[in-house]
């Protein structure tokens, strides 16, 4: 049976496809004119603020009410600053600093930047409680392992973003923190132990008025032993809508991920997600072509004609998406070039207001722009130093040899985003030598050559989640056995602080986190 135009338009009203390039392709312009609800931007679409503003203006010229979304968590997952590294630390660093007013102020600054670029929904923050240090995909994206800490900072992030007129979207419901499987590749399972704690940040975000919640492709046997949360009516309709009382937009994580598409295909997973209670389908991180977007639309429409998806459920989803678009329009963020309600330079004023409301002991970030930027101030406050020896001295006596051990990143993190300590330290201590090694390069002979090359210099070894990568552990052990005066800088999750004569934990790998560590090493902090 041919699919009706009205039904296809209704299916388009719940889709957020991605695309390739810095300008919208013809197929996307056409679909927007036909009523496509949203677009998801990725780093491949972003060259700079002015270009993004032109891009979103072009999208809005085809559909004035289009929702433009982006995964901009700051820190490890950045789309706006993928080419340079983030100027703001990620969630874990903010949790370590544990200044709620600072978190809210940084989120308001981010929201103002997004609003000026014409972006109306940010798929952030992560409200996951990272209770499993071996989690391969959350880690530093979480505010921490304590549910109460995650809850207060996720709430602050929501307030900050939405004060700028940009919708926040907490993720990955009902909590991806206590898992050991990356849902890009498989189906993580959430144990019953600790599930109540994992829900706390989401429940509090709902009370905070968060506009959107992103589902996790997770199996929650205590609610549904067969279907992952994204496809489960028991989790989405029963738990999120019924028990938590959420009335905003339920957004899926990327529907092409193996945890859901592996069993049902991309289109089948999308239709099942809407039937389960989701309102918007994100796609395009890995499949950014016209045929994928058209196939999902057709699969949703076909599910209605086949009786698998009630048309009223699809219409309800489209209504919720329209209401969110109306909120962003009334907030002022939907017009390209808008500064949102937070406005230009809002960080100082927002910080002052937040500090007054929250009893902040730091004065939030007022005046921070004159000291290297608000994000750098926050990154400095997250650095922790553990000394196990009086040698080497800090600051370093001379230009060091920096060895950066670089693991492969998960798919949520742009693999081209720069990170490390070597580059900023080279600026602070001219003559610094930097060597970066991947897993296949950190061989015994290569490490011996490095030890020889570093003779007479301080040695700094930079690692990232060393506890999750045996090759990093082995390389570090090799270097420490030869140079007991080594400074170790951990830019991932610091599961251990007893490595090196001096251990510096940045609690993040954002550009500003590397800068903050370099300042400690050079004595310029």
Positions of PLM-derived features:
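Preference for extracellular/luminal or secreted protein segments
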Residues: 1-34, 263-525
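Second-shell residues forming the walls of enzyme active-site clefts
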Residues: 18, 44-64, 68, 76-79, ...
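Catalytic domains of carbohydrate-active enzymes, especially glycoside hydrolases
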Residues: 30-42, 109-111, 116-121
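Short beta-strand elements of ligand-binding domains
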Residues: 68-72, 123, 485-493
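A charged helix-plus-loop insertion that forms the helical arch/lid used to bind
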Residues: 84-99, 142-144
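Alpha-helical scaffold segments that flank or form the walls of functional sites
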Residues: 98-119, 198, 269-275
